[in-house]
Amino acid sequence: TVFDDYVRPNEVVESGEFDANYFQHIPYLDQFNEEKGTHLVNAGGIHYEPFGIYPGTKDSLDDLEDGDSIAVPNDTTNEARALLLLQDNGIIKLKDGAGLEATVNDIEENPYNVEIVELAAEQVARVAEETSYIVLNGNYALQAGYSVSKDALAYETSDSVSYTHLTLPTNSL
């Protein structure tokens, strides 16, 4: 079964309708459990799906100019990952301690005065022709026809916290 959002896959596992799902990283799982009062647990990492910065109207990060726009996912943990990747590449600086809960409100320095365009994760790739750059989750990058190794201008390293996980409800263990 394919879902087009991040909520329903966890709801069907929590309800017992499905035994497991496979799409998320630990920060999202933890946030989901806290916000929804669910009892899902990580059953182990499967593979690495890095976030990447991909070309929009610009083909290189060397072309970054004052006022450029960058589209990012707007859900809490994925927006934070996108912002951390932008910070790792010298585009913005976040407040100390912002971490995996960072939002645009945590941007402390913006030397290029970039406009951060916040969109639902599944919409980000669709604005590539309208924004200077896009920052995509690995799954949406693949779905949009991007290759991390061939198309990403920058991407998360394998020691990032962003591994995809299989989850199970606690009552099935």
Indicate residue ranges for each PLM-predicted region.
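Extracytoplasmic/secreted proteins, especially bacterial periplasmic and envelope-associated proteins
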Residues: R8, V12, E17, P27, ...
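Alpha-to-beta junction loops
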Residues: E14-Q24, D68, Y112-E115, E129-L136
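Ligand-binding "clamshell"
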Residues: Q31-A43, K58, E130, V135, ...
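Short helix-initiation/N-cap motifs at beta->coil->alpha
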Residues: V2-E11, G99-R126
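Pocket-flanking alpha-helical
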Residues: Y6-G37, D59, A141-G145
